[in-house]
């Protein structure tokens, strides 16, 4: 049995606190673009390594930087005058020694990475011309020898932690968290883009709950070729606002909701108009790990890790595995009858098996009528089960079925 500790979470349940702030940076935000590219490159490398070598080799592609371009958006359609620059950095296994033949096998790391980045941008930013609007530069280097050794040690056995680090998670999501998360998903959904094509992908949702009132302040890029006048622009905002309000009803209880879109607008002299749908075209820069946490949100009223999850290797990088695992365990513990709220923290020790954390800390708020003592064994059982099946987490990540931002 791993070192699993269960204790009472000594705090007011989040939905009963007087104030809560929650943020989500949408997929077209420069920071989220970097997160998405980093993770897409990692998933693509995993696939390439498995196809060519039969196993996932050491890599970390969590160093992606975006330097904003320059554009002249105009009502009816403007143009890009300087492309967005994307730098792919990090470390990966580029060559392997075949011990039988003595030959070195070179692996197409850079080609795989650039293709993955471009494929992601094509799907994520619908109105971007990949031939003209963006430059993708790959500078991924060979991995550190000592860390590769930790990665490769007894490959047939349990992977060993690459670092002494921790992951955190919580569940269930509060009303505010659900609304913020689902609002961005709605505005960037295929269905909404088909209905309101002028809505760009660069969307940031900031949720504030004061008592029973939730205010959503939304920054939403508009794509200029679909907007011929200021009246069109206002109409786009009105349509989007109505969609957000309607969608939020699924998650609201007795809360009042206020939705504010592009509050910095000042008639036609200052509106959030873009050529591509992202502010990355207008000098806004981006980096991996500067935005959403592993659960897709930024939650200053909850415990968070500053570790970037996207792009890290899914085999033994604690910054990735334990953050994702913490959220999975929290979700399952929160499903136990009698658990109102749950927080998870998992700490590793470098070089130790990832199934044997230094500590796995579970904090719970029981529902009225339930005692911590009766819930504790069930929570420990959930945590132990996931530690024993941690390879399933890796499999989900490698297959691209886990959201990292």
Swiss-Prot record:
Reactions the enzyme catalyzes: L-methionine + ATP + H2O = S-adenosyl-L-methionine + phosphate + diphosphate
Residues annotated for ATP binding in this entry: 141-146
Domain of life: Archaea
Keywords assigned: ATP-binding, Magnesium, Nucleotide-binding, One-carbon metabolism, Transferase
Cofactor (UniProt): Mg(2+)
GO molecular function: ATP binding; magnesium ion binding; methionine adenosyltransferase activity
Signal sequence, start to end: none
EC assignment: 2.5.1.6
Keyword Membrane: no
Sections of the chain in a coiled coil: none
Involved pathway(s): Amino-acid biosynthesis; S-adenosyl-L-methionine biosynthesis; S-adenosyl-L-methionine from L-methionine: step 1/1
Family of this protein: Belongs to the AdoMet synthase 2 family.
PANTHER family from the UniProt entry: S-ADENOSYLMETHIONINE SYNTHASE
Stated name of the protein: S-adenosylmethionine synthase
Organism: Methanococcus maripaludis (strain C5 / ATCC BAA-1333)
Lineage, opening ranks: Archaea, Methanobacteriati, Methanobacteriota, Methanomada group, Methanococci
Gene (UniProt): mat
